Design a protein with these regions (language model features):
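N-terminal presequence-like segments and the immediate start of the first folded domain
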Residues: 1-265, 270-288
């Protein structure tokens, strides 16, 4: 569950959510993420993933704070973590390191690790000022945990790293989805279309991951942009060109995973400015 809004709207949204959810609120807060005011005003959007099942998910806590849920269905079990962050350290890289350690601790608590994770979402305030540092931290952990490196099977989760910071003031936060049961059920796509493996230019994530979710086989497509094979931005200064290239890159991933536009269940677009948002809306409305 995620809420995207201007900082000034966060408390209003928190209160509204509490009133609407009532006894459905199990104490696990959504990821409140700070975005600039866009065409829709102070509130950019709310994203909720829900599963209809016979029972309520089990609440997971870290250091006494509810931060996720476990869903169990016959033969399957899933862990979702929300808004994992750290504010005990001052430097962004130190916060990222503590954040990754917290997520790993939660996974270990239930007999899993990052090899069980098909998808992560990384929320990074002022991303351009420290993205290289973040990548070094993440890569270090993934090597330590055996996701990448000699003898590994390149098991990097699909991921989004976006320049939206958590509303609690931390430099970063993360969400993740893990498959606790069945084990070793995730496939990873490293290279597709015009995009080579992101790890070649220092970003440790897969282009997509396929795994078993409650409703069946699911493909998670990573955050995708107008990037060439070497990781450089293309169509600089041309919003329409970047948007069309991004859509082309996403479709290449879908095709590689034997999917099409008709198989897409959910998508979210992050636009840097309202000007870009206007261009995106004009292109989106014309998509077949």
């Amino acid at each position: 569950e995620r809420v995207f809004s201007a900082r000034s709207a966060v408390e209003t949204l928190r209160t509204a959510r509490s009133g609407v959810y009532g006894d459905l609120d199990d104490g696990v807060a959504p990821s409140f993420l700070v975005a600039s005011e866009g065409l829709s005003g102070l509130i950019a959007g709310v994203q909720v993933h829900a599963v209809s099942s016979g029972g309520r998910p089990q609440v997971v806590d870290l250091d006494g704070v509810p931060c996720g849920r476990i869903l169990r269905v016959p033969g399957r079990a899933y862990l979702a973590l929300s808004g994992v962050s750290d504010q005990q350290h001052e430097q962004p890289a130190d916060q990222a390191r503590a954040m990754m350690q917290k997520a790993e601790a939660a996974l270990r608590k239930f007999g899993a690790d990052f090899l069980s994770v098909p998808r992560t979402w990384m929320w990074l305030k002022d991303i351009l000022s420290w993205y290289d540092d973040f990548n070094q931290v993440r890569t270090g952990f993934f090597k330590e945990w055996g996701l990448i490196g000699a003898g590994s099977r390149q098991s990097m989760p699909a991921s989004t790293g976006i320049g939206l910071g958590p509303a609690n003031g931390a430099h970063c936060a993360m969400d993740l989805m893990a498959v606790l049961e069945p084990t070793e059920c995730t496939q990873y796509l490293q290279t597709t279309g015009k995009q080579h493996c992101a790890f070649e230019y220092g970003s440790a994530f897969s282009r997509a991951a396929r795994s078993i979710m409650p409703a069946g086989e699911t493909v998670f497509v990573s955050g995708t942009a107008s990037i060439d094979a070497g990781g450089a931005t293309t169509h600089v200064g041309d919003a329409a060109g970047q948007i069309n290239a991004t859509i082309e890159n996403v479709r290449a991933v879908l095709s590689e995973m034997q999917c099409s536009d008709d198989d897409v269940v959910q998508v979210i677009a992050y636009c840097k400015t309202t000007a870009v948002e206007k261009v995106f809306n004009s292109i989106k409305d014309k998509l077949a």
